[in-house]
């Protein structure tokens, strides 16, 4: 996504023990930069005293309805955004379904983030496009996302992928003025395919054709 001679390519990967140290470093980077952590699912539980193995288990199990309900959560899958060129974790994205009533109002189907040292390079748009591919696999026709109204970078990311602003209101759970967007999954995957398909790793599970 940068203007250099070597084209960068990306893919989403399920968190694993093999990436333990890298994931811990990724989360710690947010702490060091005093930045909010988004899109990590349960992985950031390591900041609350959980072992990495416990956090990973929770993260991977959240896709199962029975497990999610036990904790009053919605089902979700978390992915690492990997830049293939240097095998580095650039960001994370969490795709959710069977939303709780709370998440239907604020939070929505997708949460994402890019590590502080890799921001302002357009990576979150790639992250969201790949997230929409995963949303389609799950069977979501449209997805809801939100962000603080002051987070102009996130708003621009959502709008760049076809996000339509539905409402702006105060989230009663944190008291922050929040913008809520909706994205039509099939429509956006097709409309913006030419902008992103060449940056997706060729081995990633992606069909380069019209979305149907």
Task: Provide a role label for each language-model segment.
Residues 2-109, 178-212:
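GNAT-family acyltransferases
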Residues 22, 127, 153:
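Charged catalytic carboxylate motif
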Residues 81, 140, 168-171:
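Catalytic cores of nucleotide-sugar-dependent glycosyltransferases that transfer UDP/GDP/TDP-activated
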Residues 82, 97, 109-120, 148:
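A short, internal acetyl-CoA/4′-phosphopantetheine-binding micro-motif in the GNAT/acyltransferase core
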Residues 87, 122, 139, 151:
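Conserved G/P- and acidic residue-centered "switch" motifs that form tight phosphate/ATP-binding loops
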Residues 111-114, 120-137, 156-160:
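Conserved acetyl-CoA-binding loop-helix of GNAT-fold acetyltransferases
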Residues 135-146:
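Conserved GNAT acetyl-CoA-binding A-motif
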Residues 146-147, 162-179:
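Conserved catalytic-core motifs of GNAT/GCN5-like acyltransferases
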């Amino acid at each position: 996504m940068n203007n250099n001679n070597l084209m960068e390519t990306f893919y989403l990967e399920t968190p694993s023990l093999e990436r333990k140290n890298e994931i811990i470093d990724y989360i710690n980077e947010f702490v060091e930069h005093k930045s909010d952590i988004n899109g990590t699912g349960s992985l950031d539980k390591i900041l609350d005293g959980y072992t990495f193995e416990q956090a990973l288990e929770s993260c991977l199990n959240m896709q199962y309805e029975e497990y999610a309900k036990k904790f009053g959560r919605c089902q979700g899958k978390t992915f690492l955004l990997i830049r293939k060129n240097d095998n580095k974790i650039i960001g994370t994205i969490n795709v959710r379904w069977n939303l709780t009533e709370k998440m239907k109002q604020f939070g929505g189907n997708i949460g994402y983030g890019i590590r502080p040292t890799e921001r302002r390079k357009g990576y979150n748009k790639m992250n969201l496009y790949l997230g929409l591919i995963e949303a389609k696999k799950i069977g979501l026709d449209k997805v809801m996302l939100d962000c603080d109204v002051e987070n102009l970078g996130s708003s621009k990311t959502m709008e760049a992928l076809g996000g339509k602003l539905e409402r702006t209101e105060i989230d009663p759970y944190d008291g922050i003025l929040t913008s809520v967007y909706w994205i039509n999954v099939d429509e956006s995957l097709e409309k913006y395919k030419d902008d992103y398909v060449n940056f997706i790793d060729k081995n990633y599970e992606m069909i380069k054709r019209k979305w149907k």
